[in-house]
């Protein structure tokens, strides 16, 4: 019984790497739905159906707790899953909760009225589906007032990263940052709202400038998971790490090894 980590592709490996560093003795089962990636251009219903299929596969593998290490799935499917699909003895958590907590400097269960926070102008870089869901804006509005969020749908970046074309990914990042800056010239902070994007964090930071605080999720999610498992020790897993993909295992293994710079072997899901 491992803790499951799900992503539409390989971006969730940034979260896996951080949680393995934070929780080195914890076994994880990682599932990449590479056959259907990217999710960011799909409809909300399609994302929901695909996410449920993959999470069910992790439940079948013995996971009682699954992390959606995919902002698109977290934004478009998580709430619906939690309300009507997840079994009572299982838990599914998303990745943007820790980010909202960090930005608003308050805990998720804090239901006090919205208040002013330190940042006023926030740039959001995410997939088209995440931007369309307005999930970040909605959750920020519940907790903070006076925050202007300008969203930039970053088409093509995930495809380039999944294909290993980092030169194209870098060019696309710079283009999307320039497009955002035409709408919001001087953001206080930037959200990398896709778990693929930390692989390009240095490029985002250079393009935005050193005065912009860039929020990247991996370490925030790792700390949040460690806290959650302390409060819910029954969800801690046992067993051996496993890597599963709906795509070609050899190809996905090579890409994952390139990303993490250590050998990762995927099997067919």
From Swiss-Prot:
InterPro entries in UniProt:
Asp/Glu/hydantoin_racemase, Asp/Glu_race, Asp/Glu_racemase_AS_1, Glu_race
- Active-site residues from the entry: 70, 194
> What pathway or pathways are given for this protein in its record?
Cell wall biogenesis; peptidoglycan biosynthesis
Which UniProt key words apply to this protein?
A: Cell shape, Cell wall biogenesis/degradation, Isomerase, Peptidoglycan synthesis
Q: What class of enzyme is it?
A: isomerase
Which parts of the sequence bind substrate? 7-8, 39-40, 71-72, 195-196
GO biological process assignments: cell wall organization; peptidoglycan biosynthetic process; regulation of cell shape
Which Enzyme Commission number(s) are on file for it?
5.1.1.3
Catalytic activity reads: L-glutamate = D-glutamate
Provide a Gene Ontology MF annotation, just one. Answer: glutamate racemase activity
Please give the Pfam families that the UniProt record associates with this protein.
Answer: Asp_Glu_race
Matches recorded under PANTHER family: GLUTAMATE RACEMASE (PTHR21198:SF2)
Function summary? Provides the (R)-glutamate required for cell wall biosynthesis.
Family assignment from sequence similarity: Belongs to the aspartate/glutamate racemases family.
- Per its record, how is this protein called by name? Glutamate racemase
């Amino acid at each position: 019984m491992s803790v499951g980590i799900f992503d539409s592709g390989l971006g969730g490996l940034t979260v896996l790497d951080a949680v393995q560093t934070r929780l080195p003795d914890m076994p994880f089962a990682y599932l990449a739905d590479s056959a259907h990636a990217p999710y960011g251009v799909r409809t909300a219903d399609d994302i929901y159906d695909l996410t449920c299929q993959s999470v069910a596969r992790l439940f079948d593998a013995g996971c009682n707790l699954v992390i959606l290490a995919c902002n698109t799935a977290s934004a478009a499917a998580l709430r619906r899953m939690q309300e009507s699909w997840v079994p009572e003895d299982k838990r599914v958590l998303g990745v943007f909760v820790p980010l909202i907590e960090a930005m608003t400097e308050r805990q998720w269960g804090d239901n006090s009225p919205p208040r002013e926070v330190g940042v006023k102008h926030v740039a959001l870089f995410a997939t088209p589906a995440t931007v369309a869901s307005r999930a970040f804006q909605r959750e920020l509005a519940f907790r903070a007032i006076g925050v202007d969020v300008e969203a930039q749908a970053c088409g093509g970046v995930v495809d380039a990263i999944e294909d290993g074309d980092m030169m194209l990914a870098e060019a696309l990042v710079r283009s999307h940052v320039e497009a955002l800056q035409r709408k919001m010239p001087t953001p206080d902070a930037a959200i990398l709202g896709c778990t693929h994007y930390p692989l390009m964090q240095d490029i985002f930071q250079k393009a935005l400038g050193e005065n912009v605080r860039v929020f990247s999720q991996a370490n925030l999610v790792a700390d949040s998971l460690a806290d959650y498992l302390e409060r819910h020790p029954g969800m801690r897993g046992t067993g051996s790490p496993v890597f599963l993909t709906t795509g070609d295992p050899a190809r996905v293994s090579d890409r994952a090894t390139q990303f993490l710079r250590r050998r990762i072997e995927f099997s067919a899901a």
